[in-house]
Amino acid sequence: MIIAIAVVAGFIMDILFGDPSWIRHPVVIMGKGISIMENALRRMFPKTDRGEFAAGLVMTIVLPVLVLAVTAGVCVAAYMVHPGLCLAVETLWCWQAFSMKGLKTESMNVYRCLAEGELNDSRKAVGRIVGRDTANLDETGVTKAAVETVAENFGDGVMSPLVFMIIGGAPLAMFYKSINTMDSMVGYKNKRFLFFGRAAAKLDDFVNYIPARLGGIMWVAGAMLSGYDYRNSWRIWRRDRRNHASPNSAQTEAACAGALGIRLAGPAYYFGEYYEKPYIGDAINEISYENIRDADRMMYCAGIVAVILAVTVRAAAVMIISAAGA
């Protein structure tokens, strides 16, 4: 019961408050831990391809286990003091595991800049939430980047944390966030991280595999509830969900592109290098900055559906287990 209440309460608090700057976010602490571990492990292991991979593998194993142990220990200790304290801790960490409000806030900053005709400001705004080069993007390019990041990060910021927390509460959600944070910091295929970050990137792909696919289905449901073309969303999801170098990223992007009848992805520049990427979706409609608002609406509807279903499934599972043990 504590986990179900914490999930719902945390989700509502994320919708209402996002990530207030006055509350220290666990991801910030994880990020500092990753930097410290990277520096220490690089000194401990040989400066060879194998040595860097081994160093990264050690961090990939140690950090998530450490995060899980600490957060679970805190929750157990809180429960021993009072179940209400445990609920408060679980709710706080579930709240911080979600990032839906933050995605909406950042994407709407891009929307406002485009609506006001401030292309340079919109490039800077979208540059804060995407990895591609944004300095030379036109209005369509900026809009595509914003829509793609809303859709893709629905997986990392809503669906995956939800799946983990509904199974094992806030500690398992923080376990997931530590893996996702490692990937965002070291999971690059550049000279510095090609070998060191490989284990973290592969683990992130693994833990996101099922949530990403559930996220695509939830996005189709969100499209239906918010009045968009859910039939085309389903069709494009089934057709284009593998059109990405990552096994997970195109799942929600495809559903979003289909719902809006637009074409996303395609070639882009990253760190000054040109990358040929497949397109996602069909260019039925012209891309408009209003699509950013559309994506946010679908994200919220998809998130609400996902939370309701997750809590329902957990409640049913608990009832079945209780009945079997009676």
Regions found by a protein language model. Give the residues of each.
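Hydrophobic alpha-helical transmembrane segments
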Residues: 1-175, 179, 187-326
